[in-house]
Amino acid sequence: MSTDTVTEVVATGMPRIGDPAPDFTAVTTQGDINFPGDYEGSWVILFSHPADFTPVCTSEFMTFASMEDEFAELNTKLVGLSIDGLYSHIAWLRTIKEKITFRDMQNVEVKFPLIEDITMEIAQKYGMIMPGEDSTKAVRAVFVIDPKGMIRTIIYYPLSLGRNFDELKRVIVALQTADALSIATPADWRPGERVIVPPAGSCGTAQERVEGKEDGVTCEDWFFCTKEVTEEEVYAAIGK
C-alpha cells in the first residue's frame, strides 16, 4: 500500500470522540472477537503498538498486564493490536513471561486479547497508521470506549514514547465520575479533589452561585464553580 493511499485512508476514516467505535471481527491471542459488540456493558481501552519484540512495547505490555485487575475493578477491559501476525504475538508474549524483567515485574502473563491485523484493515479503520511516523506500523494509539460502544477519548503517542498508564487509569475514573455525577474534572484531577460544576444555565442560577446560595458550591466567578466530592463518593458513584 502506497503512502498516498494510507494518507487518504487516515484523512477520510479517522474516528472522532463521540463517534460509535468502528466495528470489526478479529483473530486474537484469546480467540476470535466481534468488536465492540462482545464488550457491550463494559468500558474498553483499545490500544495499538508498533511491533512485537520491541523494547518500548514490551515495557508497555508488562505494565498493562500488571494493572489489568485495577482496570477490571473499573469495569474496563483491555484489547491490544498491532499489524503483526498471531504466531508472532504468541511467541512475543511467551518471551515476555519467561525471560523479561522490567522494574519489579517478572513472569508477567498477558491475558487480555492481542489482535492480529496483518492486513492493516483495523489499524486503518481507527486511524492508527500515521505516514509521518511510519506507513507500515501503527502508532501508540489509545481509544477509550464506553459501555454503549461510543468513543470517549483518543490519545496518540509517537513510536519513541511509552504511554503513561497511571494517566490512562485517571482518564477512565474521570470519565466515569463525570457521567455518574454530571460534573467535569479540572486539570490534574484525582479522586477526592474538588470537581467542576457545569456552567450555570441561567442568569438567576449564576447569581445564586456567586452569592453562595447553592449548597456545597464555591465560585471564583459565575463561570468557575467547584464542589467537594470525596474519594469515597467518587468510587461509590462509579460502582467500584
Give the predicted meaning of each segment.
Residues 1-240:
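Chalcogenol-based redox active-site neighborhoods
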